[in-house]
Curated annotation (Swiss-Prot):
GO cellular component, one term: bicellular tight junction
Membrane-spanning residues: 11-31, 88-108, 136-156, 175-195
UniProt protein name: Claudin-12
UniProt KW keywords: Cell junction, Cell membrane, Membrane, Phosphoprotein, Tight junction, Transmembrane, Transmembrane helix
The species this protein was found in: Bos taurus (Bovine)
Length: 244
């Protein structure tokens, strides 16, 4: 595995991360988190289904595409605890995942466009590409946890609502989209962890990042004139002893 080159695992993880973030965006905006089905026994009327999202609410007849009632201010009056938690959890997860994508992109760009000749003056400013991938993997795992937990809670909260009222509540496909996107974030983190563990040197500690520049760079030292003033301890002073 070419650890000092852009590997297929890092590119695949970056693309998987983009797809997962796009899925989280879609799940956040979809008005299909919960549906309430109202059945009428009048043959002259149609059944009504109320679709509840995180930000809007829509009511439509069965077989219809137009909303009879569209509540655009639903986000400020959400009375269901699981949806209220999702209003904060999903945007937070998206922000964390976007930060992870940025770190992953920085690591890949540094690996692809790094100079083969090390510059000792920029040694302290070099970006550690492998360290970026490691931190990005941790952030992807955190984003997946933040988005997956409240999304699964919606399923159990529907069971609670059906027991408390009537069995007319059901979760909609926005739950599936978000759960699948959270799974994509976990897959992205797993790919980055596998790449890092396969490339790291085994004797080194697990948390020690890889160096993106050639190892020979550590053997370079600045000229004597560029060093700071050496103390008496650092300078080997010959000791002359007088014998009588």
């Amino acid at each position: 595995m070419g650890c000092r080159d852009v590997h297929a695992a890092t590119v695949l993880s970056f693309l998987c991360g983009i797809a997962s973030v796009a899925g989280l965006f879609a799940g956040t905006l979809l008005p299909n988190w919960r549906k309430l089905r109202l059945i009428t026994f009048n043959r002259n009327e149609k059944n009504l289904t109320v679709y509840t999202g995180l930000w809007v609410k829509c009511a439509r007849y069965d077989g219809g595409n137009d909303c009879l009632m569209y509540d655009a201010a639903w986000y400020s009056s959400v009375d269901q605890l699981d949806l209220r938690v999702l209003q904060f959890a999903l945007p937070l997860s998206i922000l964390i995942a976007m930060g992870a994508l940025l770190l992953c992109l920085i690591g890949m760009c540094n690996t692809a466009f790094r100079s083969s000749v090390p510059n000792i003056k920029l040694a302290k400013c070099l970006v550690n590409s492998a360290g970026c991938h490691l931190v990005a993997g941790l952030l992807f795992f955190l984003a997946g946890t933040v988005s997956l937990s409240p999304s699964i809670w919606v399923i159990f909260y529907n069971i609670h609502l059906n027991r408390k009222f009537e069995p007319v509540f059901a979760f909609d496909y926005a739950v599936y989209v978000t759960v699948a996107s959270a799974g994509g974030l976990f897959m992205t983190a797993l790919l980055l962890f596998i790449w890092y563990c396969a490339c790291k040197s085994l004797p080194s500690p697990f948390w020690q990042p890889l160096y993106s520049h050639p190892p020979g760079m550590h053997t370079y030292s600045q000229p004597y004139s560029a060093r700071s003033r050496l103390s008496a301890i650092e300078i080997d002073i010959p000791v002359v002893s007088h014998t009588t």
